[in-house]
Amino acid sequence: MKLYYEKRGQGDPIVFVHGNGEDHHTFDTTVEVLEADHTCYAVDSRGHGESPSVEELHYEDMADDMVEFLETHDLNNITFFGFSDGAIVGLLTAMKTDRIGRLVICGANTEPRGIKGWAYRMFRGAYFLTHDPKMKVMLREPHITEEQLKQITIPTLVLAGDRDMIRERETKKIAAALPNSTLRILEEATHISYGQNSTRAAIEYIAWVQDLENR
């Protein structure tokens, strides 16, 4: 599938993938921070933004789209920067290609019940009213095992907020299973506040990369 994207900056490539119901503008502020030293590709996932609409959404299909995107644009050794659903797609994409050199996952879950109960009930109610495929995929997917996570050996920054809608034990489980991960639980941060149009994740990313380079 041909995905819409916007490209800004120059330097090491970063591919940004947004969350559910969003589009590439989720990362406008993040890109502003990073574009001086990076070529930033902000992508609209299938069924979102200006990319083609679909009747059904599945995270595996979205990951396949990203593999195709990297191959089409001949991108190698990229940083994959995913928020929420985009973080799920990042994990799955990293299992499918060796074109990713570093991974940043913000607010990821490996199973639907990794979402806190109040949020899950809210999404279930929204799906009951709208039958929106974007709601449906959150209620039924993903199903990523710890064994699968152990296959991802690239450096990975795992971010979440201390007030995130993702259960903290879920975030810690993901970080523990990834062999080469760094975990950051951000104080006074909700699921949205550090991920959408925020400098916070960008600052955490810069500090993490500097730490990797100094090891």
Identify the meaning behind each predicted range.
Residues E187-R215:
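Catalytic active-site module of serine/aspartate enzymes centered on a nucleophile-bearing elbow/loop
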Residues M1-I14, D37, I206, Q210-R215:
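Alpha/beta-hydrolase fold catalytic core
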Residues P133-Q148:
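Active-site nucleophile elbow and catalytic-triad environment of alpha/beta-hydrolase enzymes
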Residues I88-M95, L103-H131:
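Flexible "cap/lid" loop of the alpha/beta hydrolase fold
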Residues M165-E170:
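Conserved alpha/beta-hydrolase "acid-adjacent" motif
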Residues Y41, S45-T79, I203:
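Active-site loop/oxyanion-hole signature of alpha/beta-hydrolase fold enzymes
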Residues E6-E50:
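Conserved HGGG/HGGXW glycine-rich cap/lid loop of the alpha/beta-hydrolase fold
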Residues Q151-I152, V158-A160:
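Short beta-strand/loop motif that positions the catalytic acidic residue
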